[in-house]
Amino acid sequence: MDFRNSIRFLLCHIVGAAMLFGTNAFGADLASQSSESGGVTIAVKPVDVSAGAAIWSFQVSLSTQSQDLGDDLVRTAFIVNRAGKKNELPAGWVGDAPGGHHRNGILSFNALAPLPGAIELRIQRVGEKAPRMFRWDLDCPCNDPKMHAS
């Protein structure tokens, strides 16, 4: 194999590996996001939204000092799909039951395929005009943990 063919071979494999594994690496360590409105704070962190996952999971916490947190997240949360036209409802919730001032749990969804460039989770609370929106760009190099190594 001559030098040019060796370089082509190497470049093809590097590009192929980046295409195959790049999105998984970026989706592995997405930041927690929070939203405060009406005295209720909602914090969401993706746990697993990788390309190989059949189920996507999000760690969700709700906190307030002023009201009862009776939200049924399986009925009020959804992911907006690629076309933005259909809402994907949760597959389940494992965590604290409705009620009280602090709730934590894992909200799960059937994974979207193919993996979108971004994920948008919305939670519509009773009495609030608009849903809370949490969005993560999966194809952004800013999500690569290697970019933030200290």
Give each language-model segment a name.
Residues 2-14:
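Bacterial N-terminal signal peptides that target proteins for export
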Residues 84-135:
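Short, solvent-exposed, Trp/other aromatic-anchored flexible loops in extracytoplasmic proteins
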Residues 15-20:
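Hydrophobic core
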Residues 26-29, 47-50, 94, 125, ...:
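Beta-rich carbohydrate-recognition modules and glycan-binding surfaces
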Residues 22-24:
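N-terminal signal peptide c-region/cleavage motif recognized by signal peptidases
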Residues 48, 52, 65-86, 122, ...:
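Long, contiguous binding/interaction regions
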Residues 135-150:
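Short beta-strand elements
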Residues 27-77, 147:
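N-terminal secretory signal peptides
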